[in-house]
Amino acid sequence: MSHKILLVNGPNLNLLGRREPSVYGHQTLADIVAELNQQAKLAEVELEHIQSNAEFELINAIHATDAQMIIINPAAFTHTSVALRDALLGVAIPFFEVHLSNVHAREAFRHHSYFSDKAIGVICGFGSQGYEFALAAAIKRLNQPL
């Protein structure tokens, strides 16, 4: 496998399947990652995954990765984390921002993102399928000739 994508999931996403299923769906994070691993394997791309409720662990994973692309669901850090934004900008790895719910149809504080203006694209409101869309787009970009 010549390409690698880092999948970053932020706080509380470890509770998927149990936390507000009417908003976030019934799939667990493990289910979602398993499906993405199959999609990546078919495309002969390596998918590395981290989920953490600790901002510094996500930052350290971004600093340490040798991936050529990042897919990130910053979760609640979307609206608060300049540090995570700076980590992404510091490594200069292109990234897609994903959200399970349509953040623009929710509370006003969820409308602001510290990431959207720097992301290749933002996918929200499609549930777990949003990750599949982001992975397909990332794979397509990685396979485009320079």
From Swiss-Prot:
Q: Is the Amino-acid biosynthesis keyword given for this protein?
A: yes
Question: Keyword Lyase on this protein?
Answer: yes
* The protein's enzyme class: lyase
Q: Where is the active site?
A: Y24, H99
The family database entries (PROSITE patterns) matched by this protein are listed as: DEHYDROQUINASE_II
Q: What is its EC number?
A: 4.2.1.10
Q: Which keywords annotate this record?
A: Amino-acid biosynthesis, Aromatic amino acid biosynthesis, Lyase
* Catalytic activity annotation: 3-dehydroquinate = 3-dehydroshikimate + H2O
Molecular function terms, GO-annotated:
3-dehydroquinate dehydratase activity
Swiss-Prot/TrEMBL site (Transition state stabilizer) positions: R19
**Where substrate is bound, by residue?**
N73, H79, D86, L100, S101, R110
- Domain of life, per UniProt, equals Bacteria
Purpose of the protein:
Catalyzes a trans-dehydration via an enolate intermediate.
NCBIfam families on file: aroQ, PRK05395.1-1, PRK05395.1-2, PRK05395.1-3, PRK05395.1-4
Q: Which family does it belong to?
A: Belongs to the type-II 3-dehydroquinase family.
> Which HAMAP family does UniProt cross-reference here?
AroQ (MF_00169)
Name the UniProt record assigns to this protein: 3-dehydroquinate dehydratase
The organism named in the record is: Shewanella baltica (strain OS195)
- Gene field: aroQ
